[in-house]
Amino acid sequence: MPLLDSFTVDHTRMQAPAVRIAKTMKTPKGDVITVFDLRFCVPNKEILSERGIHTLEHLYAGFMRDHLNGDSVEIIDISPMGCRTGFYMSLIGTPAEADVAQAWLASMNDVLKVAEQAQIPELNEYQCGTFDMHSLDQAQSIARSIIAAGITVNKNDELKLSDEILNGL
């Protein structure tokens, strides 16, 4: 099985909250797709609560589009990581990490403005596969912790696992 890009970086050295360009690629038509690692938690030290990450999934995807989409950027998808330490965001374009961090902070402030659970988008059995597994309180607690900590940048060249380590795993 091929080694995926996300497993070639040293998770023991990742900082969080942090933005990382996980991958860039070009489509056959020449559009650039950028995949961002939006790391909310330090891997193997912290984890996002199940209800909190699910509620953030519903809120964060829309708020990030509000703050980042424009003439040169269009978000394709924002999805939670299986390890529950953050989200992957795929988009058309090449926004700077600082712009992504600004949009992320603005989105966290938007999460804090949601007044009640009923305002969570797509919170019903028709549009959500586990519509009763949500917590606005937990999502807002996560947002507050991101705002308080601030967002940094993880660089691939600083996190790259050596061939020696990869071959020994």
Swiss-Prot record:
Coiled-coil blocks: none
SUPFAM superfamilies registered for this protein in UniProt: LuxS/MPP-like metallohydrolase (SSF63411)
Annotated positions binding Fe cation: H54, H58, C128
Taxonomic source organism: Shewanella sediminis (strain HAW-EB3)
A Pfam cross-reference name: LuxS
Single GO MF descriptor: S-ribosylhomocysteine lyase activity
Originating gene: luxS
Record function comment: Involved in the synthesis of autoinducer 2 (AI-2) which is secreted by bacteria and is used to communicate both the cell density and the metabolic potential of the environment. The regulation of gene expression in response to changes in cell density is called quorum sensing. Catalyzes the transformation of S-ribosylhomocysteine (RHC) to homocysteine (HC) and 4,5-dihydroxy-2,3-pentadione (DPD).
Protein name: S-ribosylhomocysteine lyase
Similarity comment: Belongs to the LuxS family.
Highest classification ranks of the organism: Bacteria, Pseudomonadati, Pseudomonadota, Gammaproteobacteria, Alteromonadales
Entry-linked InterPro entries: LuxS_sf (IPR037005), Metalloenz_LuxS/M16 (IPR011249), S-ribosylhomocysteinase (IPR003815)
Record's catalysed reaction(s): S-(5-deoxy-D-ribos-5-yl)-L-homocysteine = (S)-4,5-dihydroxypentane-2,3-dione + L-homocysteine
Catalytic activity, EC: 4.4.1.21
